[in-house]
Every structure is written in structure tokens, then in C-alpha cells.
């Protein structure tokens, strides 16, 4: 008896199992679709060209080509995310798409961090065998990495200068210079996220007026703690507690006073606008509300991107120190290890303010309670966050 579930699809599968392979008349083949001939044959070992082949040069080329392909994918995802953000109102139904693509960037960066140990299977002596062929080539000349940084939100004024402007390494390459200029002039992901945060529901002074309530609760909390500290019988403990409370007042002053906030921005110690900081704090404190759940995850993704970028920079720095030490110049003329180490500073973190939000958190019992109107607003699946007046 014939199997009732047997279909033509299974019959065709039997032909394939017997060795009958579909021809190109059915469409593009695997290698054609992926253009593997161009990719697989794009490794040109300079040591081979010089008739002194060095085995590990092949690994070096493959790894860096893989980096560049992943950089291209990150830029592709970044551009699509920026397009979704770059509107007068952000369609909240697309937040899941933004989250998915941000998570994809995070996973790619995690993979890139794991590439470093593969390169480290090459010893410093192995690297020395072909390092001379690299000059004046340098990772500093990676156009895509510079575009990636610019599109994320690394500002030119925050970059570490090693001996020239970062654009200068591209010389007379007009196309590359135009792409760099465009990436600097266009709104970065950091810029667009700030605009989005500035429109967070609940910041309206004519509505919930979160920030005024938050300010009042913070100072009431500090006043109570100060009164309690003054009752401490032991002088050294009392003085320590009062000093700590004063420091906390000073820190909170920087988020409640716009001039104090702008002073930190001018020094590069804070990146977000005054209103964007308010939105980020609001989302963080009320992250359990349905409407703020995905925005809170989005903010976490931005921190994850910064974290993995920093981990990648750190692993890269340690690998460079291991390969060439801390005194030699890089192949492109940079200070090598010294320059790379300087890029680990907070000035390269585009979401620095999100990392520092925990400084301003208060106990749940002191978080301003939602009004009925605000509670309804945060439990409603609204499609767009409309800009406030």
C-alpha cells in the first residue's frame, strides 16, 4: 500500500538522494549567488609575491577581511535603524524591528571580540616575518570602521589625535573623504536617540511633569537622610555621612540644573542633551510599565554596543602589545599601542550617560506614583510618540 503522505516533493527528494543534482537552469547556484569566486580568491599574500611565503600572513588577511565584511553588515543595520528613528514621530510598532537589529549588531560585535584569540594563535615572531610587507597599511585606514564610529555617534572633537586628523590617512581618495564627511554631517544614532528620548511621554510640564516630581522626591529623600545623619552620635561617622550626602546633592544638581548639565557637556563628560537625560531617567524608573518595556531594552542594547566596542578595543590593544610591544610605532605611522590604549577612554563611549544613569536612581518607594491618566497612557499601545510643544 502506498504511503498516503508521500508527495511529489518527497519523490523529487528521492531523485536528489540518488545523485541527480539540479542544474543551473533552476536558478543561481550557491557559489554564484554568494560570488564566492571573488571572495575566496581575494587573498593576495605579499610574502608570496616577494617569493618568501609566510604561512601566517594568510590568517592575518582572512581575519581582517572577515572584520570588514562584518563592519559592512553593522553599517547596513545601523543605517536602517537610523532611518526608522529619523522621523518627526517614531512609529512604536517598529520598535521591535529596531530592537532586533540592535541585538544583531550586539551579536556581531560579540563575534568580532572572539576573533582576536584566533589572531593570537600567531606568535610575535610569526608576525614579524611578514610585518614589513604591511607598511604603510594600517588598521587606522579602515574606512568602514571610521564610518561605523561616526554613524554610532563618535564626534571628531572627542577623538584622540595621534599625529594627524583621522581623515588624512585616506589621502586623495575623494570617494572615501566624501563618505566620511557625509557620515559626520548626517545625524548619528546617538543624535537620533536623543531626539527620541526628548519626546518621552510624561515629560510634558502640562501633563505628568515627571521631572518636577522626581526633583522634589530626590531632595525630600536627601533632606530626610541628612536629618538622620545629624543625629548620629559618633562624630567621625556623622561627618562622613554628611559629606556623602553633600556629594550626592552636588551630583543631582547636575541633572536638575541645565547650566550645570551643559558645563559637563562642554567638557565632554556628558553626551546627552538635558531633555534626553530626563527621558532616559523616566524610562529607566518606569521600565516595568508596558509602554516603556521595549524602550528600556533599547537603551540596554545601546549600552551593550558600547560595551562590546570597548571590549574589542581592549582585546585589540592587548594583542598589539603582545605582537609589537608598547614602544614601536604602528605600520601606518601611529604610536601603535599608546594610541590604541587611549581609545579605551570614556570619550569613545557614545552611550556614556546611559551607563551613568544608575548614579541617579532612587528607591522604588520614592519613585513618583503615576497619575491615573499617565498610567492609562503607559498601558495603551499607541503607535507614535508625538513631540511635545
Swiss-Prot record:
Cofactor(s) needed for function: heme
Annotated residues for binding of heme: 316
Function per UniProt: Heme-dependent dioxygenase that catalyzes the oxidative cleavage of the L-tryptophan (L-Trp) pyrrole ring and converts L-tryptophan to N-formyl-L-kynurenine. Catalyzes the oxidative cleavage of the indole moiety.
Pathways involved: Amino-acid degradation; L-tryptophan degradation via kynurenine pathway; L-kynurenine from L-tryptophan: step 1/2; Pigment biosynthesis; ommochrome biosynthesis
Protein name: Tryptophan 2,3-dioxygenase
GO terms for biological process, alphabetical: L-tryptophan catabolic process to acetyl-CoA; L-tryptophan catabolic process to kynurenine; ommochrome biosynthetic process
Gene3D superfamilies: 1.10.287.3810, 1.20.58.480
Keywords associated with the record: Dioxygenase, Heme, Iron, Metal-binding, Oxidoreductase, Tryptophan catabolism
Amino acid at each position: 500500500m502506498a504511503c498516503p503522505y508521500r508527495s511529489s516533493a518527497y519523490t523529487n527528494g528521492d531523485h536528489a538522494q540518488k545523485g541527480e543534482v539540479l542544474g543551473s537552469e533552476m536558478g543561481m547556484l550557491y557559489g554564484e549567488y554568494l560570488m564566492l569566486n571573488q571572495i575566496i580568491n581575494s587573498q593576495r599574500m605579499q610574502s608570496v609575491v616577494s617569493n618568501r611565503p609566510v604561512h601566517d600572513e594568510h590568517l592575518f588577511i582572512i581575519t581582517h577581511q572577515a572584520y570588514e565584511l562584518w563592519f559592512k553588515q553593522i553599517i547596513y543595520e545601523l543605517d536602517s535603524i537610523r532611518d526608522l528613528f529619523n522621523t518627526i514621530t517614531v512609529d512604536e510598532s517598529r520598535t521591535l524591528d529596531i530592537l532586533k537589529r540592535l541585538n544583531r549588531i550586539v551579536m556581531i560585535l560579540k563575534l568580532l571580540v572572539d576573533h582576536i584569540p584566533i589572531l593570537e594563535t600567531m606568535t610575535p615572531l610569526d608576525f614579524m616575518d611578514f610585518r614589513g610587507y604591511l607598511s604603510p597599511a594600517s588598521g587606522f585606514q579602515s574606512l568602514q570602521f571610521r564610518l561605523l564610529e561616526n554613524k554610532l555617534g563618535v564626534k571628531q572633537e572627542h577623538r584622540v589625535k595621534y599625529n594627524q586628523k583621522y581623515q588624512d590617512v585616506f589621502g586623495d581618495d575623494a570617494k572615501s573623504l566624501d563618505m566620511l564627511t557625509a557620515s559626520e554631517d548626517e545625524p548619528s544614532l546617538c543624535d537620533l536617540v536623543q531626539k527620541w528620548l526628548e519626546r518621552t511621554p510624561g515629560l510634558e510640564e502640562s501633563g505628568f511633569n515627571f521631572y518636577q516630581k522626581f526633583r522634589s522626591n530626590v531632595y525630600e529623600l536627601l533632606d530626610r537622610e541628612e536629618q538622620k545623619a545629624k543625629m548620629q552620635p559618633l562624630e567621625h561617622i556623622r561627618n562622613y555621612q554628611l559629606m556623602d550626602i553633600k556629594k550626592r546633592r552636588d551630583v543631582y544638581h547636575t541633572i536638575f540644573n541645565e547650566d550645570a548639565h551643559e558645563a559637563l557637556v562642554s567638557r565632554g563628560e556628558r553626551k546627552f542633551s538635558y531633555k534626553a537625560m530626563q527621558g532616559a531617567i523616566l524610562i529607566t524608573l518606569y521600565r516595568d510599565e508596558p509602554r516603556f518595556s521595549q524602550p528600556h531594552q533599547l537603551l540596554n542594547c545601546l549600552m551593550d554596543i558600547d560595551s562590546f566596542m570597548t571590549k574589542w578595543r581592549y582585546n585589540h590593544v592587548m594583542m598589539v602589545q603582545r605582537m609589537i610591544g608598547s614602544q614601536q610605532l604602528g605600520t601606518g605611522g601611529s604610536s601603535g599601542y599608546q594610541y590604541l590604549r587611549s581609545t579605551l577612554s570614556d570619550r569613545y563611549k557614545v552611550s556614556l550617560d546611559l551607563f551613568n544613569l544608575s548614579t541617579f536612581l532612587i528607591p522604588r518607594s520614592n519613585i513618583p506614583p503615576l497619575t491615573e491618566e499617565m498610567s492609562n497612557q503607559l498601558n495603551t499601545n499607541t503607535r507614535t510618540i508625538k513631540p511635545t510643544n
